[in-house]
Amino acid sequence: MTEMSFLSSEVLVGDLMSPFDQSGLGAEESLGLLDDYLEVAKHFKPHGFSSDKAKAGSSEWLAVDGLVSPSNNSKEDAFSGTDWMLEKMDLKEFDLDALLGIDDLETMPDDLLTTLDDTCDLFAPLVQETNKQPPQTVNPIGHLPESLTKPDQVAPFTFLQPLPLSPGVLSSTPDHSFSLELGSEVDITEGDRKPDYTAYVAMIPQCIKEEDTPSDNDSGICMSPESYLGSPQHSPSTRGSPNRSLPSPGVLCGSARPKPYDPPGEKMVAAKVKGEKLDKKLKKMEQNKTAATRYRQKKRAEQEALTGECKELEKKNEALKERADSLAKEIQYLKDLIEEVRKARGKKRVP
């Protein structure tokens, strides 16, 4: 009973000192602490420590850490003798789950060690990425020559190729739920990101091709993905990956952004409507032009008629003026004649 209480207290001390609470590392740390305490116990016997000294030393060491379990405050003295240090005990007899207090952990120590190794493998790329600059990333393909990794010999979008993974990485499938408990910065493996790389290769070249062809953009015609895949200017880096099969044109069209141009059917309908509107406008313009011409001709005819009438009236007026003048002269002549006759008769009467 004393041995069980001491073991439970020591295991609780190791559990509190573990860096990760209730994680897979707790079991390994607790096992390591038990082994260290057993090795320390072997050295106490040859030096001849009494039970009081062993009790004082152990209590003093536990007091320095400040992690003494409240179970040691019982009336029963767990350090009454040092005979328990020489006994060989089998840890398989004890229920580690009950001692550690981990009820939700159902895996065995071997599974925990395997999960811990996988977690360390996940942390290794993160440490390398933070220590190095972003452009100088580690090449995951070990058999490629260094000449292909130079920036002056790589195609503009070679970084979007899906990288072939090693069999070890593909075979190992770590528990993502366990890795997420250790920290939020854990990223997914390269195998899970492989479809994303393929999608990027399918989408980006089409955009680059559209930007590199100003003549097509000027004329309003965009090169189709089929013609781009069949063009001789296709990057050799994308051809050099035989393990990757290119997606179908339907997948390319579905993943690419929608084109800003209208379908040909809508273009034809719009052209017909525009042609009809233009014809109606031209007909209306012709009608307006004809009406204006007719109006001008009518006004010209009316003006000519008025001018002719005016000239005729002017001629009549001149004739009437001449006749009036002649009549006025005749009247004056007659007046003068009558006056002379009157004078002549008056002279005849006077004598």
UniProtKB/Swiss-Prot annotation:
Residues 210-268 are annotated as: Disordered. Keywords: Acetylation, Activator, Biological rhythms, Cell membrane, Coiled coil, Cytoplasm, Cytoskeleton, DNA-binding, Hydroxylation, Isopeptide bond, Membrane, Nucleus, Phosphoprotein, Repressor, Transcription, Transcription regulation, Ubl conjugation. A motif (BetaTrCP degron motif) lies at residues 215-224. Pfam families: bZIP_1 (PF00170). Changing residue 164 to A: Increased stability in low oxygen conditions. The modification N6-acetyllysine is found at residue 311. Residues 278-341 form the bZIP domain. Changing residue 156 to A: Increased stability in low oxygen conditions. CDD domains: bZIP_ATF4. PROSITE patterns: BZIP, BZIP_BASIC. GO terms for cellular component: ATF1-ATF4 transcription factor complex; ATF4-CREB1 transcription factor complex; centrosome; CHOP-ATF4 complex; chromatin; cytoplasm; cytosol; dendrite membrane. Induction: Regulated at the translational level in response to various stress such as endoplasmic reticulum stress, amino acid starvation or oxidative stress. In the absence of stress, ribosomes re-initiate translation at an inhibitory open reading frame (uORF) upstream of the ATF4 transcript, which precludes AFT4 translation. In response to stress and subsequent EIF2S1/eIF-2-alpha phosphorylation, ribosomes bypass the inhibitory uORF and re-initiate translation at the AFT4 coding sequence. Transmembrane segments: none annotated. The BetaTrCP degron motif promotes binding to BTRC when phosphorylated. This is Cyclic AMP-dependent transcription factor ATF-4. The lineage of its organism: Eukaryota, Metazoa, Chordata, Craniata, Vertebrata.
